[in-house]
Amino acid sequence: MQRDLILHIGTSKTGSTSIQRVMSRQRTALARQGLYYPASPGQESHVLLTMAAMADRRLYGSPDRPIWGGIGPDARLARFRDEFASEMAAIPAECRRIVVSAEQFSMLLRDTQSVQNLHDLLRPYADTMTVVVYLRRQDQHFASLFSEMLRWGDAQAPDLLTMQPYAQHGYNYVNLVNRWARVFGRRFVRPRLYSPVAGTRFDVVEDFLQVCGASLDLTALSSARVANSSISHAGQMLLVALAERIRSRDPAQGRNVQSPLWRKLTAATSAALPGTGWRPTQAEARAFVERYGASNELVRQRYFPKRQTLFDPDFSALPLQPVAVDDAALSDAATRLMAALGTVTGPQAAPPPDRQAGFDAVLDAMLAQAEAAARQHDGVAVAAARLAQTAGDRQRHRTALATRLQIDPANTAARLELAALYLEDGDRRAAAYCVGAVLRTHPGHPGALALQHRLAATSSAPH
């Protein structure tokens, strides 16, 4: 039976999240049309496939990242490979096309070996594979990316020149396309332009569905397609200032301020202060795009020969001069954010007396809110774990314990309970990770030592 696979690799800020939300929420409708959207690599984004393919383990990040489910990268990826193989083996015969999507493919698979690893993971399940990648004019991409950088904790004043590290692997589009073409074959790589005609309506979800050969009624899915909305310019600058305040309080804090506190702060800012964010000037944007003129031209010649230029060369919608956010706008943003946090009420609340007082008030309120939220979230996770335990639902029990560890990675009780569950299920790798994590911080912990002894006993038991 012939089966093909469409591999959507991003890039970022080209509607990937909207595509993934629609695909994940319409799995049944897609299956009726012969398309299969896997769930084991992720309910929406298939980020676990990215992690499984990465040759550079340094990109895994902290072993306590939510993606690792409380058991670290090695154990989680081992479980994923088993789950993925089982899911692929059970694809209904009538599904002749598999669709895989994650913008992290283009962001994190930065070398040919990583791309080859992904190819080898997917090759057993498809006779042909086609890579789809959306490209966006570089200055427009960065302006959109800035809000995301703030959410990630990389809170610096916007400057196109500071993007050089990203640009080396992200904005040279001919290098990006060639890396995937070397592995999958040039005729199986299909670049698409994000909003290819200036001033016309472009819907990336509709475009991708057309590429997949699918048809869905999208009128009832409008809410699913709104994702990663921009933060207003004042909100962005407020976050930059708050990040500076966090760094000043903690001299050991590095450039990145990502933390549960920061995630809550950026979520509140996104909700309270949406709008058009920072934009470069016309001259800045033009100079930035011109850096990649040769690369863009090669992509145009190879894949878009009928176009005069790869991207629309019109920069007139951008400001001529830099747009600054004054103290009054920042104070207003701080007041609105505090109202969203529940620390002030009503539109008549007095603004902070000056800029620094506003920042300090928001940060202090945020710290108090984060502590209260952490207690509340942990209480919910505790209740969920107990309910799942009572019901005998081991998967939900594990998920609730992993949630507790996301809230507090130092929660030894939750980690040991999770270890015991995995040991009972026969997953020694996951159990060993949890036990080792406790013993690294609490070398003589009796509960951890007891589980370590059980692990040793199971490894030496006759089979």
Which residues are covered by each model-predicted region?
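Anion-recognition interface
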Residues: 1-381, 386-390, 420-424, 458
